[in-house]
Amino acid sequence: MKLCKKLFSFILVLSIMLSSVSAFAAPNANESGINEYNLAPGTTVICVEAFVLGWGYVLEPTVVAYNPGETLAQLTARVLAANSLACVMNGAVDDDASYIQGIGCPQLAAGASPSVPAYLMTELEAYPDWAEENLGYQPGGWNGTENGDGILSEFEYSDLGGWMYVENDVSLPVGAGAATVTDNKVYRW
């Protein structure tokens, strides 16, 4: 029995070690460079976050297939609709100049109030003039409110509030209507 337990422990430890080694193994290369996420061709990752309001994810990171030539605005609208989340666009979804004005937010629809993480509040309160000028934050509260439709939209809670995206943690110099989706990227709103 002791031998069986030792053998089982050894196999368990070995399998854990081998699985962690594969996580650090060299990523697969593809035609555009490095495929660090090991996603299938024609797929990418998209998520919508509301961490700054203390609400976590609106849409968890999701691997999705995209259509060749599809823009981030088109993909976002399609994925949000598939997840029963509203997507309010400024302009047509296929317009290069379009951008996302609002996204349906279940936390907001459920009546949640902002619960900004303490480390952010500490910074806001340490620099009140900057916070008011750049974020629309006044000590003791926000100068904006939500309009009650369950959609987190631009200018709500802050005069400068709005949806921005990053591609692999890099802000791109074009709007979502002009950003073409490509393989192996993570798009975060």
Per-range role (PLM):
Residues M1-L3:
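N-terminal secretory signal peptides that target proteins for export/translocation
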Residues K5-S15:
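Sec-dependent N-terminal signal peptides
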Residues S15, S19, F24-W189:
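Ubiquitin-like/PB1-type beta-grasp interaction modules and other compact soluble beta-rich domains
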